[in-house]
């Protein structure tokens, strides 16, 4: 069934993020800049990618007033904030001290662009925003990887190895940030186990033991985890 429409963007189409960017540049970006100059009493920042965005404030009062103003702004375009994805949290250099004084436990975390962001420190004790692979993203990507390995199960091992190596390099290129070494190693470990499982399933007479598989990896090593985005302040 097909029906023409002049509203919205094609779901899943490559042009949809571009159209969303153009629309939100006017509906959100420019408006936030104007609000910041006109109404903010402290520092604030906007970070946006497509329709995911993050607003940071120096002062809680600004955040509260922006929450009201933003809802009104989006309503003019027939939009509203996603209730499950919209939160106002205390985060930053003084969050841990403030929450400890109020007996509220550790600072909350937030997810943005595939990372879970949380308050941490550098090796010399300075505040630093730490990032780790978002748990849901990791689970989903590993599931997709296992499904693709199953589909490629009967390809030559050399072709499987080449494909998996490219997947790992792409993962490191995006998620290889300071403080996320554990997340990279975990992805590699699970990817290796998934590949071994796929090879074992295709062997009818002689299954691939771990000894044979480890010998295969020594002869054809997979790319090791590497950080692609390193900040000067080393994570603790």
Region spans (language model):
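Non-catalytic terminal/accessory segments
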Residues: 1-236
């Amino acid at each position: 069934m097909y029906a023409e429409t002049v509203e919205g963007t094609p779901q899943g189409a490559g042009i949809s993020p571009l159209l969303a960017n153009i629309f939100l540049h006017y509906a959100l970006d420019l408006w936030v800049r104007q609000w910041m100059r006109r109404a903010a009493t402290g520092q604030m920042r906007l970070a946006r990618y497509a329709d995911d965005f993050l607003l940071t404030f120096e002062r809680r009062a600004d955040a509260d007033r922006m929450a009201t103003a933003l809802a009104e702004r989006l309503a003019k375009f027939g939009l509203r904030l996603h209730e499950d994805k919209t939160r106002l949290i205390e985060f930053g250099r003084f969050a841990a001290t403030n929450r400890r004084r109020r007996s509220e436990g550790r600072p909350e975390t937030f997810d943005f662009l595939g990372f879970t962001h949380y308050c941490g420190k550098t090796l010399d004790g300075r505040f630093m925003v730490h990032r780790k692979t978002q748990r849901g993203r990791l689970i989903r990507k590993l599931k997709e990887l296992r499904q693709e390995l199953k589909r490629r199960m009967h390809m030559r091992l050399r072709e499987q190895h080449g494909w998996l190596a490219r997947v790992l390099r792409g993962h490191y290129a995006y998620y290889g940030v300071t403080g996320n070494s554990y997340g990279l190693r975990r992805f590699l470990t699970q990817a290796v186990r998934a590949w071994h499982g796929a090879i074992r399933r295709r062997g009818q007479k002689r299954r691939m033991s771990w000894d044979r598989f480890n010998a295969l990896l020594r002869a054809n090593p997979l790319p090791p985890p590497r950080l692609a985005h390193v900040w000067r302040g080393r994570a603790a």
